[in-house]
Amino acid sequence: MTKEEEILNFLSTNVFDPILSSKTASKALKTGVRTTIYRLKQRDAKGMVQYFWAALKGTPRSIKFAELMKKEGVKRFEDVLDEFRERFTKYLK
């Protein structure tokens, strides 16, 4: 498994897949998840980790998306922060 696959697998398992398979998640939320996956796939492992940290730091788009995720009661990047940091920060080097 490549570094990129490892990161995407982790985020898919813990954040993305539960939303995409949810019968109650809004269309806007599912579209946002698909867009995030698309953007992540365009990056190498270092870029994926940087994208994750930028989303947590807050961009205008990521702040609104995180608010929507919170409103709908789904797991967010913030919820997997500790494990993500432990597993993937090494890819920034």
Question: What residues fall within each predicted segment?
Answer:
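Short terminal alpha-helical segments
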Residues: 1-32, 81-92
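Short cationic/low-complexity microdomains
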Residues: 2-11, 51-68
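Amphipathic alpha-helical interaction modules
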Residues: 17-60
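Amphipathic alpha-helical binding modules
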Residues: 56-93
